[in-house]
Amino acid sequence: MMKKKSWFTLMITGVISLFFSVSAFAGNVFWEPLSYFNSSTWQKADGYSNGQMFNCTWRANNVNFTNDGKLKLSLTSPANNKFDCGEYRSTNNYGYGLYEVSMKPAKNTGIVSSFFTYTGPSHGTQWDEIDIEFLGKDTTKVQFNYYTNGVGGHEKIINLGFDASTSFHTYAFDWQPGYIKWYVDGVLKHTATTNIPSTPGKIMMNLWNGTGVDSWLGSYNGANPLYAEYDWVKYTSN
């Protein structure tokens, strides 16, 4: 009886220890498979447009989940020369740390598929942003960029050596007080060290078509529906 009691006590102690280890780890890591709408963690943008170069209206109906467990953002047209697009963003703000995503961008001229952090005047802060963007006109490349108090101009185009629109790959940036490092499938591709942003922001993913920025995105030809897919997101704090 004593042997059974000792074994049971040991087992319970082990389970409790494992629970607290996982809890402590979870305090530093946010990881989520994007297989369903978790309203406690995420929001769907709905019913408004960013204006300026964004030629679409964010719609909750353009944020969906596939049967095989992927987030699917869509660009659609409800009427002639009217477009709806999809954006998914975290409810919480996140600061310095490693941000990772497994995604497959849409391919078409005049569009952008993205993964980024953002905060700005609408959130009561300065405009700070860190970007991973795919310009649909050439998905064999990825663009990295960032803004600090609204100052950007740090675009860096990287040749991937593959077409990102055909399969899922992992893209990441490590944001620290003195630098930002961007990675593709775990390989360092670019480092920035000047005027690094500091304000925590929301984790965001979106798909949209542009207007008035043909020199950057190419001219959007009205093709729809178009889709960008996301498998999972992970954030590891300092």
Curated annotation (Swiss-Prot):
This is Beta-glucanase. Residues 29-238 form the GH16 domain. Residues 1-26 form the signal peptide. The keyword DNA repair does not apply. Pfam families: Glyco_hydro_16. One of its GO terms (molecular function) is licheninase activity. It comes from the Bacteria. Keywords: Disulfide bond, Glycosidase, Hydrolase, Signal. InterPro entries: Beta-glucanase/XTH (IPR044791), Beta_glucanase (IPR008264), ConA-like_dom_sf (IPR013320), GH16 (IPR000757), GH16_AS (IPR008263). Gene3D superfamilies: 2.60.120.200. It catalyses: Hydrolysis of (1->4)-beta-D-glucosidic linkages in beta-D-glucans containing (1->3)- and (1->4)-bonds. Its EC number is 3.2.1.73. NCBIfam families: BGlucanaseBglS. The active site is at E129 (nucleophile), E133 (proton donor). Disulfide bonds join C56-C85. The keyword Amino-acid biosynthesis does not apply. GO terms for biological process: carbohydrate metabolic process.
